[in-house]
């Protein structure tokens, strides 16, 4: 299969939404029956985002095969059916590490290692390898044109486009067209300068996607086309919308997909966007509203919980409920009390690392249990629910995780030293293992117990969900907690690790060690989140048993 490439770059400012624009194009092309994949090239020197602060970089998205990747890959999976893998995201750090490893091994036979050709060739090789077996590969380069970090990537995609030829490669550039209220018009000069910068490194964009708070007037589109060397029909307006799921329809109405198919000589049927139309309809026509409290410590940057936020929205669509997320800093609960949780229809405690704010999360789990408020715990959210139950119901005073208190009398959560992965291999870790890339990562099989809420929600005896953790329930103390009434409803493939717990004495109290948010999509939702939001709706209407 011959793969055609669309390289996506951004200019003027960062955070314009390259990932959303690229994913929207991918969604339309997929709706035309084409097999599409996506890639994100990140210019930073970290090998992967696994050890980066969520408040700096946003969430780390975990793929099925266990790669810790950029949050844009989450957008890709929510917009198209293709599952991302380790090959769909790589960083400058990863490329340099691989090249230096080869140099040490002697693979270059004594050559002087340089950015050109060695680094650029390594980037090109990875792009080609990551796109095999698809009709179209959309390759997004992180950062902004002009950044020094992205130059090797820009040079690599320039070379690749030359080698592939015009019939197999094209460039889409996303830029900002600001509206100046004082002048009463949009300004095209930043876009012209951005394209000029791109031309200076040998790249002529074929499509310009113009971000603005309004549609670009026809005269301004003509001006952009004239001064940026693109056809007028290739100047696409991407105005601000109240839902990112409206963007595929917005850009399709301007013929973005036709530009691609014409360029590559692809004869494909018209895009069927009926699934996206259904999503937009559900979003615009809710029958009720719920407020869900998200108790975390990275709340100053909502992107730190991007997939959880989106999964809650998807669950709202499935239940025809408008979901409002109220972020609650777990440290504030420690200082101001659980009164901060009053008036919520449900409580969600997401994943996290480190002891800052952990007692606030434990108190949130206690509040939900005692007040019969729907509770969903994810990763650390499951562990704090277990710790709270052990302390306050099972009589294990001072129970904790060894992540936060190595001297606790009741270490109900401890480091996983050994587990069996999806392929049957035994993975081992110790306290001295590196932080980066050493967690239990990726999709794992989980057995669900009969007669549990988890089994009822999923409607299946076995499921596959993605993990990202290095601490687990301590099996030595597990019987004591179960005897006190907590139900273990999900177990790992070898039935040795606890994957899900629930409280049978509570109307809806479910927690999972895995991250269900990574597999939720706007078209399909996710059973765990759908059940959680449904319970929140019942609670808000007073239908919950107290």
UniProtKB/Swiss-Prot annotation:
Active site: 379 (nucleophile), 515, 517
Keywords: ATP-binding, Glutamine amidotransferase, Ligase, Magnesium, Metal-binding, Nucleotide-binding, Pyrimidine biosynthesis
Residues the entry annotates as binding UTP: 14, 187-192, 223
Pathway(s) it belongs to: Pyrimidine metabolism; CTP biosynthesis via de novo pathway; CTP from UDP: step 2/2
Repeat found in the keyword field: no
Binding, Mg(2+): 72, 140
Chain positions recorded as L-glutamine binding sites: 352, 380-383, 403, 470
Classification via InterPro entries: Class_I_gatase-like, CTP_synthase, CTP_synthase_N, GATASE, GATase1_CTP_Synthase, P-loop_NTPase
Annotated residues for binding of ATP: 15-20, 72, 239-241
GO cellular component, one term: cytosol
Domain Glutamine amidotransferase type-1: residue ranges: 291-542
Pfam families named among the record's database cross-references: CTP_synth_N, GATase
Regulation: Allosterically activated by GTP, when glutamine is the substrate; GTP has no effect on the reaction when ammonia is the substrate. The allosteric effector GTP functions by stabilizing the protein conformation that binds the tetrahedral intermediate(s) formed during glutamine hydrolysis. Inhibited by the product CTP, via allosteric rather than competitive inhibition.
Subunit structure: Homotetramer.
Similarity section: Belongs to the CTP synthase family.
Leftover remarks: CTPSs have evolved a hybrid strategy for distinguishing between UTP and CTP. The overlapping regions of the product feedback inhibitory and substrate sites recognize a common feature in both compounds, the triphosphate moiety. To differentiate isosteric substrate and product pyrimidine rings, an additional pocket far from the expected kinase/ligase catalytic site, specifically recognizes the cytosine and ribose portions of the product inhibitor.
PANTHER family found in the cross-reference section: CTP SYNTHASE (PTHR11550), CTP SYNTHASE-RELATED (PTHR11550:SF0)
Protein name in the entry: CTP synthase
Name of the coding gene: pyrG
